Amino acid sequence: MTAAYLPSILVPLVGLIFPALGMALLFIYIERETIA
């Protein structure tokens, strides 16, 4: 079953992509506020 391999792929994905996305959105928000 491919379901056995799902956590080993999903955990790093969530652990790396979500913080990076959150930091990127926060950075864009701060930059947009300081320029405006």
Swiss-Prot record:
InterPro entries recorded: PSI_PsaI, PSI_PsaI_sf
Keyword Transmembrane helix included in the entry's annotation: yes
Pfam families: PSI_8 (PF00796)
Job description of the protein: May help in the organization of the PsaL subunit.
Residues making up the signal peptide according to the UniProt record: none
A GO CC annotation given for this chain: chloroplast thylakoid membrane
GO biological process: photosynthesis
Keywords noted in UniProt: Chloroplast, Membrane, Photosynthesis, Photosystem I, Plastid, Thylakoid, Transmembrane, Transmembrane helix
Topology of this chain in the membrane: Single-pass membrane protein
Subcellular location: Plastid, Chloroplast thylakoid membrane
Sequence similarity: Belongs to the PsaI family.
Organism name: Porphyra purpurea (Red seaweed)
Protein name: Photosystem I reaction center subunit VIII
Membrane-spanning segments: 10-30
HAMAP family referenced in this protein's UniProt entry, alphabetically: PSI_PsaI
Lineage: Eukaryota, Rhodophyta, Bangiophyceae, Bangiales, Bangiaceae
Gene label: psaI
